[in-house]
From Swiss-Prot:
Gene: cmk-1
Active-site residues (renumbered): 144
MF (Gene Ontology): ATP binding; calcium/calmodulin-dependent protein kinase activity; calmodulin binding; metal ion binding; protein serine kinase activity
Name assigned to this protein: Calcium/calmodulin-dependent protein kinase type 1
Root EC class: transferase
Motif Nuclear localization signal, chain ranges: 2-7
Species of provenance: Caenorhabditis briggsae
Signal sequence segment: none
Region (Autoinhibitory domain) location: 278-318
Activity-regulation annotation: Activated by Ca(2+)/calmodulin. Binding of calmodulin results in a conformational change that generates functional binding sites for both substrate and ATP, and thus relieves autoinhibition and lowers the Km of substrate binding. Must be phosphorylated by ckk-1 to be maximally active but this does not appear to be required for activity in AFD neurons.
Function of the protein: Calcium/calmodulin-dependent protein kinase that operates in the calcium-triggered CaMKK-CaMK1 signaling cascade which results in transcriptional activation. Transcriptional activation occurs at least in part through phosphorylation of crh-1. Regulates gene expression, sensory morphology, and function of the AFD thermosensory neurons. Involved in long-term adaptation of AFD neurons to temperatures warmer than the initial acclimatized cultivation temperature.
Residues binding ATP, per UniProt: 28-36, 52
Amino acid sequence: MPLFKRRDVNTPAPTSSIREKYDFRDVLGTGAFSKVFLAESKTDVGQLYAVKCIDKKALKGKEESLENEIKVLRKLRHNNIVQLFETYDEKQFVYLVMELVTGGELFDRIVAKGSYTEQDASNLIRQVLEAVSFMHDNGVVHRDLKPENLLYYNQDEDSKIMISDFGLSKTEDSGVMATACGTPGYVAPEVLQQKPYGKAVDVWSIGVIAYILLCGYPPFYDESDANLFAQIIKGEYEFDAPYWDQISDSAKDFISHLMCCDPEMRFTCQSALEHPWISGNTAYTHDIHRTVAVHLKKSLAKRNWKKAFNAAAAIRQLQLLRLSPIATAFRNKRPNSNQRLQLPNVLVFQYFCKIP
Protein backbone atom coordinates (compact mmCIF):
# COMPACT_ATOMS: atom_id res chain seq x y z
CA MET A 1 0.00 0.00 0.00
CA PRO A 2 1.40 3.47 -0.83
CA LEU A 3 2.81 5.42 2.08
CA PHE A 4 0.92 8.59 1.25
CA LYS A 5 -2.65 7.43 0.76
CA ARG A 6 -4.26 10.88 1.12
CA ARG A 7 -2.81 14.12 -0.18
CA ASP A 8 -3.55 17.78 0.25
CA VAL A 9 -5.68 18.84 -2.73
CA ASN A 10 -3.23 21.70 -3.26
CA THR A 11 -0.24 19.30 -3.31
CA PRO A 12 -0.73 16.75 -6.12
CA ALA A 13 1.34 13.59 -6.06
CA PRO A 14 4.50 13.90 -8.18
CA THR A 15 4.35 11.57 -11.17
CA SER A 16 8.09 11.46 -11.89
CA SER A 17 11.20 10.39 -10.01
CA ILE A 18 12.71 13.04 -7.76
CA ARG A 19 16.02 12.84 -9.63
CA GLU A 20 14.27 13.89 -12.83
CA LYS A 21 13.41 17.19 -11.19
CA TYR A 22 16.34 17.80 -8.80
CA ASP A 23 20.12 17.53 -8.98
CA PHE A 24 21.46 16.13 -5.71
CA ARG A 25 24.61 17.81 -4.45
CA ASP A 26 26.31 17.80 -1.05
CA VAL A 27 25.17 15.84 1.99
CA LEU A 28 24.06 18.42 4.57
CA GLY A 29 23.52 15.98 7.42
CA THR A 30 23.27 12.32 8.30
CA GLY A 31 20.99 10.73 10.89
CA ALA A 32 20.35 7.21 12.12
CA PHE A 33 18.01 6.35 9.23
CA SER A 34 18.12 9.32 6.89
CA LYS A 35 20.27 11.82 5.05
CA VAL A 36 19.66 15.42 4.07
CA PHE A 37 20.97 16.55 0.69
CA LEU A 38 21.44 19.95 -0.89
CA ALA A 39 19.49 19.79 -4.15
CA GLU A 40 19.03 22.16 -7.09
CA SER A 41 15.91 22.38 -9.20
CA LYS A 42 16.44 21.35 -12.84
CA THR A 43 13.55 23.52 -14.00
CA ASP A 44 14.47 26.61 -11.97
CA VAL A 45 18.27 26.72 -12.14
CA GLY A 46 19.86 28.19 -9.03
CA GLN A 47 16.89 27.40 -6.78
CA LEU A 48 18.19 25.29 -3.90
CA TYR A 49 16.35 22.99 -1.49
CA ALA A 50 17.06 20.64 1.39
CA VAL A 51 15.91 17.10 0.55
CA LYS A 52 15.47 14.61 3.38
CA CYS A 53 15.96 11.05 2.16
CA ILE A 54 14.44 8.40 4.46
CA ASP A 55 15.19 4.69 4.13
CA LYS A 56 11.89 2.79 3.84
CA LYS A 57 13.31 -0.29 5.54
CA ALA A 58 13.99 1.80 8.64
CA LEU A 59 10.57 3.43 8.31
CA LYS A 60 8.63 0.16 8.44
CA GLY A 61 5.99 0.27 11.16
CA LYS A 62 6.42 4.03 11.60
CA GLU A 63 4.70 5.23 8.44
CA GLU A 64 1.89 6.82 10.42
CA SER A 65 4.29 9.08 12.33
CA LEU A 66 5.89 10.33 9.12
CA GLU A 67 2.49 10.85 7.52
CA ASN A 68 1.47 12.90 10.56
CA GLU A 69 4.54 15.13 10.22
CA ILE A 70 3.84 15.62 6.52
CA LYS A 71 0.18 16.36 7.20
CA VAL A 72 1.19 19.03 9.71
CA LEU A 73 3.77 20.65 7.42
CA ARG A 74 1.30 20.82 4.53
CA LYS A 75 -1.11 22.67 6.80
CA LEU A 76 1.38 25.32 7.86
CA ARG A 77 2.36 28.13 5.50
CA HIS A 78 4.04 30.86 7.53
CA ASN A 79 7.10 33.07 7.06
CA ASN A 80 8.71 31.68 10.22
CA ILE A 81 8.03 27.98 9.62
CA VAL A 82 10.28 25.81 7.45
CA GLN A 83 8.17 24.83 4.45
CA LEU A 84 7.59 21.42 2.91
CA PHE A 85 7.25 21.72 -0.88
CA GLU A 86 6.93 18.16 -2.19
CA THR A 87 7.04 14.53 -1.16
CA TYR A 88 8.20 11.57 -3.24
CA ASP A 89 7.34 8.00 -2.29
CA GLU A 90 9.69 5.79 -4.29
CA LYS A 91 10.70 2.15 -4.13
CA GLN A 92 13.46 2.34 -1.52
CA PHE A 93 13.19 5.85 -0.12
CA VAL A 94 10.77 8.57 0.90
CA TYR A 95 11.93 12.08 -0.03
CA LEU A 96 10.82 15.34 1.57
CA VAL A 97 11.69 18.48 -0.42
CA MET A 98 12.09 21.22 2.19
CA GLU A 99 12.88 24.91 2.26
CA LEU A 100 16.65 25.43 2.57
CA VAL A 101 17.62 27.28 5.74
CA THR A 102 21.27 28.34 5.95
CA GLY A 103 21.62 30.78 8.85
CA GLY A 104 22.50 28.32 11.60
CA GLU A 105 21.12 27.63 15.06
CA LEU A 106 19.85 30.37 17.35
CA PHE A 107 22.42 30.05 20.16
CA ASP A 108 25.40 29.72 17.81
CA ARG A 109 24.49 33.00 16.12
CA ILE A 110 24.02 34.85 19.42
CA VAL A 111 27.44 33.71 20.64
CA ALA A 112 29.00 34.88 17.36
CA LYS A 113 27.36 38.32 17.48
CA GLY A 114 29.34 41.39 18.51
CA SER A 115 26.49 42.82 20.56
CA TYR A 116 23.16 41.57 21.85
CA THR A 117 20.40 43.25 23.83
CA GLU A 118 17.20 42.41 25.67
CA GLN A 119 15.38 44.09 22.80
CA ASP A 120 17.00 41.60 20.40
CA ALA A 121 15.70 38.75 22.57
CA SER A 122 12.23 40.30 22.55
CA ASN A 123 12.27 40.45 18.75
CA LEU A 124 13.32 36.80 18.52
CA ILE A 125 10.59 35.63 20.89
CA ARG A 126 8.00 37.74 19.05
CA GLN A 127 8.74 35.87 15.82
CA VAL A 128 8.48 32.51 17.58
CA LEU A 129 5.19 33.52 19.22
CA GLU A 130 3.72 34.66 15.90
CA ALA A 131 4.60 31.37 14.24
CA VAL A 132 3.36 29.23 17.14
CA SER A 133 0.18 31.30 17.39
CA PHE A 134 -0.41 30.50 13.71
CA MET A 135 0.17 26.79 14.43
CA HIS A 136 -2.27 26.85 17.33
CA ASP A 137 -4.90 28.67 15.24
CA ASN A 138 -4.57 25.78 12.78
CA GLY A 139 -4.94 23.14 15.48
CA VAL A 140 -1.26 22.11 15.61
CA VAL A 141 0.83 21.64 18.77
CA HIS A 142 4.59 21.45 18.13
CA ARG A 143 5.49 19.63 21.40
CA ASP A 144 9.27 19.98 21.00
CA LEU A 145 10.11 23.67 20.89
CA LYS A 146 13.74 24.22 21.86
CA PRO A 147 16.66 26.37 20.66
CA GLU A 148 18.03 23.62 18.38
CA ASN A 149 14.78 23.81 16.40
CA LEU A 150 15.01 27.59 15.94
CA LEU A 151 17.13 28.40 12.90
CA TYR A 152 18.09 31.60 11.14
CA TYR A 153 16.82 31.70 7.57
CA ASN A 154 20.12 33.01 6.16
CA GLN A 155 23.38 34.66 7.19
CA ASP A 156 22.03 38.22 7.01
CA GLU A 157 22.32 40.25 10.20
CA ASP A 158 18.56 40.85 10.20
CA SER A 159 17.61 37.30 9.19
CA LYS A 160 14.26 35.99 10.37
CA ILE A 161 13.91 32.98 12.67
CA MET A 162 12.48 29.70 11.34
CA ILE A 163 10.84 26.92 13.35
CA SER A 164 11.83 23.43 12.23
CA ASP A 165 11.46 19.75 13.18
CA PHE A 166 7.80 18.78 13.40
CA GLY A 167 8.53 15.12 14.12
CA LEU A 168 6.69 15.20 17.45
CA SER A 169 3.96 17.65 16.43
CA LYS A 170 0.31 16.71 16.74
CA THR A 171 -2.99 17.99 15.42
CA GLU A 172 -5.77 18.51 17.93
CA ASP A 173 -8.23 16.56 15.77
CA SER A 174 -6.08 13.41 16.22
CA GLY A 175 -7.30 12.88 19.78
CA VAL A 176 -6.35 13.66 23.37
CA MET A 177 -2.65 14.33 23.88
CA ALA A 178 -1.18 12.56 26.90
CA THR A 179 2.05 11.02 25.57
CA ALA A 180 5.18 12.07 27.43
CA CYS A 181 7.43 13.55 24.75
CA GLY A 182 9.67 16.52 24.14
CA THR A 183 13.13 17.45 25.40
CA PRO A 184 14.09 17.43 29.11
CA GLY A 185 14.48 20.99 30.34
CA TYR A 186 11.87 22.40 27.95
CA VAL A 187 8.92 20.11 28.67
CA ALA A 188 5.90 21.47 30.57
CA PRO A 189 4.86 20.21 34.04
CA GLU A 190 1.57 18.71 32.85
CA VAL A 191 3.44 16.50 30.36
CA LEU A 192 5.69 15.14 33.12
CA GLN A 193 2.63 14.56 35.31
CA GLN A 194 1.13 12.48 32.47
CA LYS A 195 -1.97 14.63 32.35
CA PRO A 196 -3.88 15.38 29.15
CA TYR A 197 -2.39 18.54 27.65
CA GLY A 198 -2.71 20.94 24.75
CA LYS A 199 -1.33 24.12 23.20
CA ALA A 200 -0.13 25.49 26.53
CA VAL A 201 2.87 23.11 26.50
CA ASP A 202 4.36 25.12 23.62
CA VAL A 203 3.96 28.36 25.55
CA TRP A 204 5.87 26.89 28.51
CA SER A 205 8.72 25.91 26.17
CA ILE A 206 8.85 29.43 24.74
CA GLY A 207 9.13 30.74 28.30
CA VAL A 208 12.14 28.50 28.92
CA ILE A 209 13.75 29.70 25.68
CA ALA A 210 13.11 33.35 26.61
CA TYR A 211 14.73 32.77 30.01
CA ILE A 212 17.87 31.33 28.40
CA LEU A 213 18.03 34.14 25.83
CA LEU A 214 18.33 36.67 28.66
CA CYS A 215 20.95 35.00 30.84
CA GLY A 216 22.53 32.20 28.81
CA TYR A 217 21.65 29.31 31.14
CA PRO A 218 18.45 27.26 31.66
CA PRO A 219 15.92 27.87 34.46
CA PHE A 220 15.92 24.18 35.39
CA TYR A 221 19.03 22.05 35.59
CA ASP A 222 20.21 18.87 37.27
CA GLU A 223 22.40 15.98 36.15
CA SER A 224 19.61 13.66 37.30
CA ASP A 225 16.51 13.68 35.10
CA ALA A 226 14.39 12.76 38.13
CA ASN A 227 15.57 15.85 40.02
CA LEU A 228 15.23 17.99 36.90
CA PHE A 229 11.63 16.86 36.41
CA ALA A 230 10.84 17.50 40.08
CA GLN A 231 12.07 21.10 39.66
CA ILE A 232 9.91 21.58 36.56
CA ILE A 233 6.77 20.12 38.14
CA LYS A 234 7.17 22.48 41.12
CA GLY A 235 8.13 25.41 38.90
CA GLU A 236 11.31 25.98 40.92
CA TYR A 237 13.38 28.61 39.14
CA GLU A 238 14.98 31.92 40.12
CA PHE A 239 16.05 35.18 38.52
CA ASP A 240 19.52 34.93 40.00
CA ALA A 241 21.65 37.91 40.95
CA PRO A 242 23.85 39.32 39.55
CA TYR A 243 22.91 37.98 36.09
CA TRP A 244 19.30 39.09 36.22
CA ASP A 245 19.97 42.45 37.88
CA GLN A 246 20.52 43.98 34.43
CA ILE A 247 17.27 42.55 33.02
CA SER A 248 14.00 44.51 33.09
CA ASP A 249 11.15 43.69 35.47
CA SER A 250 8.94 43.56 32.38
CA ALA A 251 10.98 40.66 30.98
CA LYS A 252 10.75 38.79 34.29
CA ASP A 253 6.99 39.35 34.42
CA PHE A 254 6.64 38.10 30.85
CA ILE A 255 8.58 34.91 31.58
CA SER A 256 6.63 34.29 34.80
CA HIS A 257 3.37 34.29 32.83
CA LEU A 258 4.75 31.82 30.29
CA MET A 259 6.33 29.49 32.86
CA CYS A 260 3.21 29.25 35.00
CA CYS A 261 2.71 25.71 36.32
CA ASP A 262 -1.07 25.87 35.89
CA PRO A 263 -1.76 25.59 32.14
CA GLU A 264 -5.16 27.23 32.64
CA MET A 265 -3.47 30.34 34.06
CA ARG A 266 -0.57 30.34 31.60
CA PHE A 267 -0.49 32.93 28.83
CA THR A 268 -1.67 31.96 25.38
CA CYS A 269 0.50 32.97 22.44
CA GLN A 270 -1.87 35.83 21.71
CA SER A 271 -1.79 37.20 25.25
CA ALA A 272 2.01 36.87 25.24
CA LEU A 273 2.18 38.90 22.02
CA GLU A 274 0.18 41.64 23.75
CA HIS A 275 2.54 41.87 26.73
CA PRO A 276 4.50 45.17 26.89
CA TRP A 277 7.84 43.34 26.69
CA ILE A 278 6.82 42.15 23.21
CA SER A 279 4.42 44.80 21.93
CA GLY A 280 5.72 47.85 23.81
CA ASN A 281 9.09 49.42 24.53
CA THR A 282 9.88 47.97 27.96
CA ALA A 283 12.78 45.76 26.80
CA TYR A 284 16.15 47.27 27.75
CA THR A 285 18.60 48.22 25.01
CA HIS A 286 21.96 47.95 26.79
CA ASP A 287 24.40 45.26 25.65
CA ILE A 288 24.15 41.94 27.56
CA HIS A 289 26.19 39.92 25.06
CA ARG A 290 29.20 39.25 27.27
CA THR A 291 27.22 37.69 30.13
CA VAL A 292 24.84 35.73 27.90
CA ALA A 293 27.57 34.48 25.53
CA VAL A 294 29.76 33.17 28.38
CA HIS A 295 26.93 31.01 29.71
CA LEU A 296 25.73 29.97 26.26
CA LYS A 297 29.20 28.72 25.34
CA LYS A 298 29.17 26.47 28.39
CA SER A 299 25.67 25.23 27.56
CA LEU A 300 26.62 24.54 23.94
CA ALA A 301 29.75 22.64 24.97
CA LYS A 302 27.72 20.51 27.38
CA ARG A 303 25.01 19.90 24.78
CA ASN A 304 27.53 18.83 22.15
CA TRP A 305 29.18 16.47 24.63
CA LYS A 306 25.81 14.90 25.47
CA LYS A 307 24.97 14.60 21.78
CA ALA A 308 28.21 12.72 21.16
CA PHE A 309 27.60 10.54 24.23
CA ASN A 310 24.04 9.69 23.12
CA ALA A 311 25.23 8.83 19.60
CA ALA A 312 27.88 6.51 21.04
CA ALA A 313 25.30 4.96 23.38
CA ALA A 314 22.96 4.35 20.44
CA ILE A 315 25.70 2.56 18.52
CA ARG A 316 26.54 0.44 21.57
CA GLN A 317 22.87 -0.49 22.02
CA LEU A 318 22.57 -1.46 18.38
CA GLN A 319 25.70 -3.61 18.63
CA LEU A 320 24.36 -5.31 21.76
CA LEU A 321 21.04 -5.85 20.02
CA ARG A 322 22.77 -7.54 17.09
CA LEU A 323 24.65 -9.83 19.47
CA SER A 324 21.71 -10.65 21.72
CA PRO A 325 20.05 -14.12 21.68
CA ILE A 326 16.76 -12.54 20.61
CA ALA A 327 18.36 -10.83 17.63
CA THR A 328 20.20 -14.04 16.71
CA ALA A 329 16.94 -15.97 16.83
CA PHE A 330 15.32 -13.40 14.55
CA ARG A 331 18.16 -13.68 12.08
CA ASN A 332 18.08 -17.48 12.12
CA LYS A 333 14.38 -17.87 11.51
CA ARG A 334 11.77 -15.88 9.67
CA PRO A 335 9.48 -14.18 12.21
CA ASN A 336 5.76 -14.67 11.84
CA SER A 337 3.44 -11.74 11.26
CA ASN A 338 2.97 -11.16 15.00
CA GLN A 339 6.68 -10.90 15.79
CA ARG A 340 8.64 -7.67 15.57
CA LEU A 341 12.15 -6.91 16.66
CA GLN A 342 12.16 -3.71 18.70
CA LEU A 343 14.97 -1.21 18.20
CA PRO A 344 16.29 0.70 21.20
CA ASN A 345 14.18 3.76 21.99
CA VAL A 346 17.15 6.08 21.55
CA LEU A 347 17.46 5.04 17.90
CA VAL A 348 13.77 5.56 17.22
CA PHE A 349 13.99 8.97 18.92
CA GLN A 350 16.99 10.01 16.84
CA TYR A 351 15.20 9.09 13.65
CA PHE A 352 11.97 10.93 14.28
CA CYS A 353 13.65 14.00 15.71
CA LYS A 354 16.11 16.36 14.11
CA ILE A 355 19.21 14.92 12.49
CA PRO A 356 22.11 15.39 14.92
